[in-house]
Curated annotation (Swiss-Prot):
Keywords: Aminoacyl-tRNA synthetase, ATP-binding, Cytoplasm, Ligase, Nucleotide-binding, Protein biosynthesis. It comes from the Bacteria. It comes from Mycobacterium sp. (strain JLS). GO terms for cellular component: cytoplasm. The lineage of its organism: Bacteria, Bacillati, Actinomycetota, Actinomycetes, Mycobacteriales. Its EC number is 6.1.1.19. Disulfide bonds: none annotated. GO terms for molecular function: arginine-tRNA ligase activity; ATP binding. This is Arginine--tRNA ligase. One of its GO terms (biological process) is arginyl-tRNA aminoacylation. It catalyses: tRNA(Arg) + L-arginine + ATP = L-arginyl-tRNA(Arg) + AMP + diphosphate.
Length: 550
């Protein structure tokens, strides 16, 4: 009996209890929840349904809890149901009913935990979208990990997800990048507002290798040559870094295409039709204050050039015309103002602002020997994705960045995350998987085969704790997807790994010496197989490897 099965049983039972007493069943919540008590002595699961419903139907919650407990005790699979406190019901599940979870996991395999909760959603997930003027910095690296994990997580719940990178190749930052390349190619100092770092010299040399006469061209042609070749080279490096990090995108959209394809003009025309823009001081303004923004925004500057928000408007319109019903933007800590701005832009275009969702990620700091690490050797300024991977590896880098809520700044201790110790969270989880894999190999050598026929033999309290935690995995995925919080998967896996290690220390899985394999060995091996599957499924969502050996 899974937590979902128990919740369904509880709702059915509550409906019958209320109906029998001529009480209003409409008072029942659409979704009934059960929770695992912190204290195991309080049972396997608990519910506060009587507290939710009692006053609505004019019954003392504790009395209603008593009715529910009496009815539940008679239900198949329920070992006991007891009233606690002002109206809680504590439940214990019969081992045979509870242990069905193990068979469900083995049968479902890599699809265990998946659901159709978001099957109707067509989601555009835009993340990283770093300027093509340098390597991806540590903040963008956080989004590369979290965004990719979120995309995988949403997909487990049935959503159609497109991972998109918005390529900012239009604007002043590209002009500064080009000036920096040309200065490096000429052997001149970096311009005052330019980009430093050895990568600039590397790219400048590659531009000259592709077009040896680039510096001899007229100024306009020279700049265009360095722009076209240099931006492509930089973006190729970014794509390779992301791919090596385990993050790939379905779509790359060029900001410049919004301006060259007529998308910006189309968006402006839509705004004019909606009466959402006006002229002032020679510029064209968007009435974003009418839709919740803190001030109106310039769309077309007084010199006739589109402002940055013009591209944002066109890009949102483009996404909606491609059929996405939810557009998630994952932005850096300095973009809080974009939440109201993007929602206002959607409303001004005549769309539902709830089709826009903005996630803001906080800062990431690296620490070595108790001191902050601030300088990248290659970029010359901030720490990059490549720096982090070089220091602790892809798995530890991804896990460390996903493990905390995105609205929390994080410090990554390089010594901790590169250590082979239980204090290293990713090592702790991966070691559990490797230990389970070794157990499977040893079982094969001994001729022990996992069997779900006698799961009723799994009655040890450590077995029950592990099984109940395995049953939580679908709910963890559903809530993590709904809340856009993939860090919940990390915390769950660490908790599950702990339950497994405690089970393994208390319950011998394989026969020893001349002992013949028995049904209990087979049932425990099935439990280990299910645990290994769930850990592998969780790590796959995070984009972290599940090693067979460590």
């Amino acid at each position: 009996m899974t937590p979902a099965d128990l919740a369904d049983l509880l709702r059915t039972t509550a409906t019958a209890v209320l109906t029998e007493r001529d009480l209003d069943t409409a008072a029942l919540p659409a979704t009934v929840t059960v929770e695992r008590p912190r204290n195991p002595e309080h049972g396997d699961y608990a519910t506060n349904l009587a507290l939710q419903v009692g006053k609505k139907v004019g019954v003392n919650p504790r009395e209603l809890a008593g009715w529910l407990a009496e009815a539940l005790t008679a239900a198949a699979g329920i070992a006991s149901a007891e009233v606690a406190g002002p109206g809680f019901v504590n439940l214990r599940i019969e081992a045979a009913a509870q242990n069905v979870i193990v068979g469900d996991i083995i049968t479902s395999a890599e699809r265990y935990g998946h659901s159709a909760a978001l099957a109707e959603r067509n989601i555009n997930l835009e993340f990283v979208s770093a300027n093509p003027t340098g390597p991806i910095h540590i903040g963008g690296t956080r989004w590369a990990a979290v965004g990719d994990a979120l995309g995988r997580l949403l997909a487990t719940q049935g959503a159609a997800v497109v991972r998109e990178y918005y390529f900012n190749d239009h604007g002043a930052q590209i002009d500064r990048f080009v000036s920096s390349l040309i200065a490096a190619a000429k052997g001149e100092p970096t311009p005052e507002d330019g980009y430093a770092g050895s990568y600039i010299g590397d790219i400048a040399a590659q531009v000259l290798a592709k077009d040896p006469g680039a510096l001899e061209l007229p100024d306009g042609e020279m700049r265009e040559t360095f722009r076209a070749i240099g931006v492509d080279l930089m973006f190729d490096h970014i794509k390779i870094s992301l791919h090596d990090f385990g993050t790939d995108f379905d779509v790359f959209t060029h900001e410049d295409s919004m301006h060259t394809s007529g998308r910006v003009e189309e968006a402006i025309a839509r705004l004019r039709e909606n009466g959402a823009i006006y002229e002032k001081d020679g510029a064209t303004w968007l009435r974003t204050t009418d839709f919740g923004d803190d001030k109106d925004r310039v769309v077309i500057k007084s010199d006739g050039a589109p402002a940055y928000i013009a591209g944002d408007l066109a890009y949102f319109l483009d996404k909606r015309q491609r059929g996405f019903d939810l557009c998630i933007y994952m932005l850096g800590a300095d973009h809080h103002g974009y939440i109201a701005r993007l929602k206002a832009a959607a409303a001004a275009l005549g769309d539902d602002p709830d089709t826009v969702e903005v996630m803001i990620g906080q800062m990431v700091n690296l620490v070595r020997d108790g001191q902050p690490v601030r300088m990248s050797k290659r970029a010359g300024t901030v720490i990059t994705l490549d720096d982090l991977v070089e220091a602790i590896g892809v798995d530890a880098a991804r896990y460390s960045l996903i493990r905390s809520s995105v609205d929390t700044p994080i410090d990554i201790d390089l010594a901790l995350w590169s250590s082979a110790s239980n204090e290293n969270p990713v090592y702790y989880v991966q070691y559990a998987h490797a230990r389970l894999s070794a157990l499977a190999r040893n079982a094969a050598d001994l001729g022990v085969v996992a069997d779900t026929a006698r799961l009723d033999l799994l009655t040890h309290d450590k077995e029950g704790t592990l099984i109940r935690n395995l049953g939580e995995f679908p709910r963890v995925l559903e809530s993590a997807a709904a809340l856009r919080e993939p860090h919940r998967v990390c915390r769950y896996l660490e908790d599950l790994a702990g339950d497994y290690h405690r089970f393994y220390d208390s319950c011998r899985v394989l026969p020893q010496g001349d002992e013949a394999p028995g049904s209990l060995h087979q049932a425990r091996l099935a439990l280990c197989q299910a645990t290994r599957q769930v850990i592998a499924n969780g790590l796959a969502i995070l984009g972290v490897s599940a090693p067979e050996r460590m």
